[in-house]
A protein has these predicted regions:
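Conserved GNAT-fold acetyl-CoA-binding loop/helix
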Residues: 21-42
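Acyl-donor (CoA/ACP) binding surface of acyl/acetyltransferases
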Residues: 1-23, 51, 55-178
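PAS-family sensory/regulatory domains
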Residues: 27, 216-218
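Terminal output helix/cap of sensory domains in signal transduction proteins
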Residues: 39-42, 111, 218
Length: 218
């Protein structure tokens, strides 16, 4: 469940905001003092117009947050993005709730909103080069490499890996295999991706083991 942050979320937010490793993965200063945590929470709640809490449906407890913001200037200046409309996502999930599909579910919901209802051309998402779980999640969702940036953090300069996901309704088909693969790979049934000549170009892992045997791409 995604919703705006509420004052009642502060204790749950404070519980995961003090995680130093999470702060390092996000490139922010460590939050130890309650005043610093409060300042950070109030900013997200009151000043970020598109910051949403990621909430467990069963108990309505906050387990993370997701931001939708304008594209960073260095990425907005890239030639391949000129004339295109996009937004940047950032997210975090408390350690106890990671690897349970919550982040993927939240990101997919936001992507659907940005693509289907707001008609953006792309969604951009990145992570620091040492944040392997985030990188793998983005790639699993169909994001493709866009650029590397070197940015300052409280712990020193770090390199980021920036990814992009194109809107399938506004993008040439040649760019979309990664997107569609990410969608059908979530299905436990046999699903195939074909071109207009009905030639199989991709089968999800649940379909067959030997793609080439059935005329598909390896």
């Amino acid at each position: 469940l995604l919703r705006r942050l509420e004052e009642a979320d502060f204790p749950a937010y404070a519980a995961y905001a003090v995680d130093d490793e999470m702060s390092r993965m996000m490139g922010r200063a460590f939050l130890h003092a309650e005043t610093d945590i409060r300042q950070n929470f109030d900013w997200l709640k009151d000043k970020e117009p598109r910051c949403y809490g990621i909430v467990e449906k069963a108990n309505e407890q906050l387990i993370g947050n997701l931001n939708i913001v304008a594209l960073p200037a260095p990425l907005a200046a890239l030639p391949q993005l000129q004339g295109k409309r996009g937004q940047t996502l950032s997210f975090c999930i408390r350690r106890e709730s990671q690897r349970k599909g919550y982040a993927a579910e939240a990101i997919r919901a936001v992507i659907a909103e940005l693509f289907d209802d707001e008609h953006f051309d792309f969604v951009q998402c990145g992570c620091y080069s040492f944040n392997t779980p985030s990188r793998m999640l983005q790639e699993r969702l169909g994001f493709q490499f866009l650029a590397n940036l070197c940015v300052p953090t409280p712990q020193g300069e770090a390199q980021t890996i920036e990814h992009i996901l194109w809107n399938p309704r506004r993008t040439p088909m040649s760019d979309l295999n990664a997107y569609f693969k990410s969608v059908i790979d979530q299905d436990t049934a046999s699903v195939v991706l074909c071109d207009l000549n009905h030639t199989i170009v991709y089968m999800n892992p649940a379909a067959v083991v030997d793609y080439k045997k059935y005329g598909g791409a390896s």
